[in-house]
Amino acid sequence: MSYYGAGMLRARWASWRDWRQQRRGQANARWGWIKPPAGRGPAIWMQGFADFDDLRLAADLAKAIREKRLDLRVVLTFEAEHPDLLEQMDGVPGLGYGFGPCDHPQAVARALERLTPLRYLALGAPPRRHLAAALTQRAIPAVLLGTGPGLGPLPPVEAVYPRNTEQAEAWRSLLPAARIEDPVDFSTLITVAQVEPNFRALACGGDDWQLWWVAGVSAASAGRWIQAWQGSPLRRSGLLFLSGQGVAPAGLERMSRWARTPLAPGSALWVDEGRWHPALAVAAQGVHLEAASTGDIWQAFAGGRPLSAAPLSRLSRPEAMGPELVPILTAPGAVLARWQGLLGDPMAAREQGDAARRAFWAERRRAGERLPAFLERVFAW
């Protein structure tokens, strides 16, 4: 990921590289040269940083804000580009998007001068140190969603919408209780909840293989998963799907190159396209969350399959991820042994999957009930 901190030399170096690679818009925006949409209405600055799931939510909220307040101009900035996501925002009146500034005081000041925002909204992380200080200096209220507090100074917080109880507790010593909303995860509203269950037929043909999915695999851990898989009896009648960030590990076929023909039992594939995740969540007999994003976590819950997980940060994991519903497992062999046990106890597997699905829908209902109040806050600005 490109540099967006406060260091002058590193930020200049990052911008020079962007210029060399014809990314002039990113280079200019890093130093605050951001242009709001045309118009005279007040501007709202939404900062989505680099996380794909936070940006998905930011894009949907930006469109909802525009529908609620037609006079507002909404500026959504990010630090990593996702072209498929950005296409969804093309043509929305009063909505602009692009790369954001780094945290050097000069870049922050220039961005705020050009945007003169009525409010600042951050999703997934709090504003960095110099931006938080500048918001305070200019008395620009901030609304923070899905994040705990950072290590630097606080901006003038109007409200926080924590994702879970742990985030809410982290705010209690810093803010009056009236500014801390009850925990809610709005990302459940953009989770794909209804999926046609045809992926199994595509992968297995006329055979009845079991499908297993591990989400959030790193390149370093992929080898351990393959080694454990090759020694597991599940391999005789199963297919293993590993998804994660970065380049596919050596020897693993990528889903983007899969010819959509039935797979042989024992096959292992690297899922390098996120569009397959909803189908995998529904088709798999079991899902393990190694270092998964919030989006993948809720997608797995929505799929209604037995879940397990590696230890995840308490500040970022969903409220529903208690050990009674999602056992904590670290070694690939332990996960495969759990899956083997689920094959021998289909009733328990069904009950665990149903409980996961109920947890997803309960959180989605809460988010749906809370969203109108958030939009009413926007309407009152």
What label would you give each PLM region?
Residues 89-99, 249-272:
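Nucleotide-activated donor-binding/catalytic signature segment of Leloir-type glycosyltransferases, i.e.
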Residues 115-119, 265-293:
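Acidic donor-binding loop of glycosyltransferase active sites
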Residues 157, 278-359:
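Catalytic binding pocket for nucleotide-activated donors in carbohydrate/polymer assembly enzymes
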Residues 29-32, 41-190, 217-221, 232, ...:
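Active-site and donor-binding regions of nucleotide-sugar-utilizing enzymes
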Residues 53-68, 191-262:
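Conserved catalytic-core segment of nucleotide-activated headgroup transferases in glycan assembly
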Residues 26-39, 151, 194-203, 220-225, ...:
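A short, well-structured juxtamembrane/interface segment
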Residues 363-381:
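C-terminal alpha-helical cap of glycosyltransferases
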Residues 1-40:
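Positively charged, low-complexity intrinsically disordered leader regions
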